[in-house]
UniProtKB/Swiss-Prot annotation:
Highest taxon listed in the record's lineage: Bacteria
Keyword set, alphabetical order: ATP-binding, Chaperone, Cytoplasm, Isomerase, Nucleotide-binding
Catalysis performed (reactions): ATP + H2O + a folded polypeptide = ADP + phosphate + an unfolded polypeptide
Organism name: Burkholderia pseudomallei (strain 1106a)
EC identifiers of the protein: 5.6.1.7
Any Gene Ontology biological process: protein refolding
Pfam families named among the record's database cross-references: Cpn60_TCP1
Binding site for ATP: 30-33, 51, 87-91, 415, 479-481, 495
Assembly information from the UniProt record: Forms a cylinder of 14 subunits composed of two heptameric rings stacked back-to-back. Interacts with the co-chaperonin GroES.
PROSITE patterns for the chain: CHAPERONINS_CPN60
Similarity comment: family membership: Belongs to the chaperonin (HSP60) family.
Gene3D superfamilies listed in its UniProt record: GroEL (3.50.7.10), GroEL-like equatorial domain (1.10.560.10), TCP-1-like chaperonin intermediate domain (3.30.260.10)
UniProt name for this protein: Chaperonin GroEL 2
Length: 548
C-alpha cells in the first residue's frame, strides 16, 4: 500500500479552499447572458469551446492532491445539480464557493464548524420554502420558450425549437438532440410509436421513391418466437386475405420458407405483408411487444398465455390506421388500442421508473412512456464546424433539461433575483446560539453571489446593482442582456424553480462538509525531492555551500 500524507486543521482547509476557488473561478466566468467561453484541450482532435459549467468542471484535475480533493467536491456539486435538474451547474458552483469562502473566515476565527453548518442548513431550508412560495407554474408555450432561451444563453431560436417540440409531442413526449447535417437547426417529429427495426426484405417496399413499405389499415401480428414454418402462419394469413387488409408481422425473426412465401405473395399482389423483427432483447423485448399490443388493441401470441400461431384469429391481431416501415425503423400511426388500457400501461411503467435504480433503465422506461403517451421529437443541431455544433448541442441539452424542470416545479424570476427575494425569509431566522446565527449570515451573503457574478461578467458594478435590486420587490431585477432594470418575468428572464432549489441545496451540502473537515489523507508524492536539512546554508540545486 502506498504511503499516505496527512494534513490537519487550518492547513488542510486552506488547501481545500484553494482547490474550490481554482475550479469555481474557471466555471463562473460562463454565468449569465454575457458570460465568457472556456476552451477545453482535447488529446485528439479540435479543442472544445463551451459555456456549459458542468463541461468545464468535469475537465479539471489539479496537480496538488489536496487542492484536487476540494475541486472534486465542488465538481460533485455541479454533477449532482446537472443530474437532478439538468441545468444550474454554474449557479451551484458559485453558491458553493461563496458559502465555503465566508464560512472559512468564521472557522479561522474560532467559531464551531458544526454550529455553522446547522445555521447554514436552517437558512437553506427556509430559502427553499420561500422559493416554493414565489414559484409559479408554467402554463404557456411562450413561458417554455423563455425558460429554454435563458438556459441556452439567450439564443431565441433554440428556445423556440424546444417550445415547438413540446407543443408537438406533449409534456410526456421524448425530445432527443442529435448532430445535424446542415447549417440550420431542424426539428423532426415522429407521430405514433416508432421502434428501431426495419423490413426483413427489400421486396416488401411499395414506395420505392421513399424506400418505404407503407400499409394502410393493416392487421398487426405480434409473436415472441421465430417463424420459419409457413404452415404455422397459413390459418391467420387466410383470415387476413379474406378480410382484404394488409398484414404487419412483428416477431423475434421471420426466416426460411415463411419469409420466402410472404415475399412471393407480396410481389404477386395476393396478400400485402411486411415482416419485421421485434425490438429489444430478452425481457425488454417482451415488454415492448406488450406495449405495441396495448397500443394497437391486439395480443402477443405467446405460449405463456396459451396462444399459438396455428390457432390465432383476427381478434388477437392489433390494428392501426397506417404503418410505415423503412430500412431501420418501423412507425405505427394511430393504433386502435383503448385509451383506458393505454393509460393503465403508462401508469404501470411510471411505477417502474420510480423504482428503477440505474439511469439506463430509467431512460429506457421513460422512452416507453413517451411512445405510448406522447411522441418523439428530434432536434438536429446545425452549424458551420464540428466545434460550433458541439458547443451549441451542449446549450440545447441544458435548455431542454431546464424546460423539463420548469414544467415539473414551475418558474421563478431569473437573473439571480429569486435568491435575493428569499433573503427576507432568512433574515427573520434566529439561531440557537451566536455560531448558528453566523451560519445563517453566511447564506444571506452567499445568496447575492450569483447576481454579483452575472453583473461582473456583463462588465458592470456588482455592488450597485445588488443594492438596487434588493431595494425593489417581486420580479423587479437587472436584465444583464439589455443592461436595464425592470420586471424580469415580463421581459422573459425566468429560471426553473427546480434548478434554483437544487443548486442551493447541493451547494450548501458540499460546503457544509468542507467547513467541518479537519484532516485530509492523500497519497504522498512519489518523486518528491529530499528535503534539505534545516540550517544548511545554500542547500539547493548546486549542493551545500555553493552559491550561484
Amino acid at each position: 500500500m502506498a504511503a499516505k500524507e496527512i494534513i490537519f486543521h487550518d492547513g488542510a482547509r486552506a488547501k481545500l479552499v484553494e482547490g474550490v476557488n481554482l475550479l469555481a473561478n474557471a466555471v463562473k466566468v460562463t454565468l449569465g447572458p454575457k458570460g465568457r467561453n472556456v476552451v477545453l484541450e482535447r488529446s485528439f482532435g479540435s479543442p472544445v469551446v463551451t459555456k456549459d459549467g458542468v463541461s468545464v468542471a468535469k475537465e479539471i484535475e489539479l496537480a496538488d492532491k489536496v487542492q484536487n480533493i476540494g475541486a472534486q467536491l465542488v465538481k460533485e456539486v455541479a454533477s449532482k445539480t446537472s443530474d437532478a435538474a439538468g441545468d444550474g451547474t454554474t449557479t451551484a458552483t458559485v453558491l458553493a464557493q461563496a458559502i465555503v469562502r465566508e464560512g472559512q473566515k468564521y472557522v479561522a476565527a474560532g467559531l464551531n464548524p458544526l454550529d455553522l453548518k446547522r445555521g447554514i442548513d436552517k437558512a437553506v431550508a427556509a430559502a427553499v420554502d420561500e422559493l416554493k412560495k414565489i414559484s409559479k407554474p408554467t402554463t404557456t408555450s411562450k413561458e417554455i420558450a423563455q425558460v429554454a432561451t435563458i438556459s441556452a444563453n439567450g439564443e431565441e431560436s433554440i428556445g423556440q425549437r424546444i417550445a415547438e417540440a413540446i407543443d408537438r409531442v406533449g409534456k410526456e413526449g421524448v425530445i432527443t438532440v442529435e448532430d445535424g447535417k446542415s447549417l440550420a437547426d431542424e426539428l423532426d417529429v415522429v407521430e405514433g410509436l416508432q421502434f428501431d427495426r426495419g423490413y426483413l426484405s427489400p421486396y416488401f417496399i411499395n414506395h420505392p421513391e421513399r424506400q418505404l413499405a407503407v400499409l394502410d389499415e393493416p392487421f398487426i401480428l405480434l409473436h415472441d418466437k421465430k417463424i420459419s414454418n409457413i404452415r404455422d402462419l397459413l390459418p391467420v394469413l387466410e383470415q387476413v386475405a379474406k378480410a382484404g387488409r394488409p398484414l404487419l408481422i412483428v416477431a423475434e425473426d421471420v426466416e426460411g420458407e415463411a419469409l420466402a412465401t410472404l415475399v412471393v405473395n407480396n410481389i404477386r399482389g395476393i396478400l400485402k405483408t411486411v415482416a419485421v423483427k421485434a425490438p429489444g432483447f430478452g425481457d425488454r423485448r417482451k415488454a415492448l411487444l406488450e406495449d405495441i399490443a396495448i397500443l394497437t388493441g391486439g395480443q402477443v401470441i405467446t405460449e405463456e398465455t396459451g396462444l399459438t400461431l396455428e390457432k390465432a384469429t383476427l381478434q388477437e391481431l392489433g390494428r392501426a390506421k397506417r404503418v410505415e416501415v423503412g430500412k431501420e425503423n418501423t412507425t405505427l400511426i394511430d393504433g386502435a388500442g383503448d385509451k383506458p388500457n393505454i393509460d393503465a400501461r403508462v401508469k404501470q411503467i411510471r411505477a417502474q421508473i420510480a423504482e428503477a435504480t440505474s439511469d439506463y433503465d430509467r431512460e429506457k422506461l421513460q422512452e416507453r412512456v413517451a411512445k405510448l403517451a406522447g411522441g418523439v421529437a428530434v432536434i438536429k443541431v446545425g452549424g458551420a464546424t464540428e466545434v460550433e455544433v458541439k458547443e451549441k448541442k451542449d446549450r440545447v441539452d441544458d435548455a431542454l433539461h431546464a424546460t423539463r424542470a420548469a414544467v415539473e416545479e414551475g418558474i421563478v424570476p431569473g437573473g439571480g433575483v429569486a435568491l435575493i427575494r428569499v433573503k427576507q425569509a432568512i433574515a427573520a431566522l434566529a439561531g440557537a446560539n451566536a455560531d448558528q446565527k453566523a451560519g445563517i449570515s453566511i447564506v444571506l451573503r452567499a445568496l447575492e453571489e450569483p447576481l454579483r457574478q452575472i453583473v461582473a461578467n456583463a462588465g458592470e458594478e456588482a455592488s450597485v446593482v445588488v443594492a438596487t435590486v434588493a431595494a425593489g420587490q417581486g420580479n423587479y431585477g437587472y436584465n444583464a442582456a439589455t443592461g436595464e432594470y425592470g420586471d424580469l418575468v415580463e421581459s422573459g428572464v425566468l429560471d426553473p424553480t427546480k434548478v434554483t432549489r437544487t443548486a442551493l441545496q447541493n451547494a450548501a451540502s458540499i460546503a457544509g462538509l468542507l467547513l467541518t473537515t479537519d484532516a485530509t489523507v492523500h497519497e504522498a508524492p512519489k518523486d518528491a525531492p529530499p528535503t534539505a536539512p534545516a540550517g544548511v546554508p545554500g542547500a539547493g540545486a548546486g549542493g551545500p555551500g555553493f552559491d550561484f
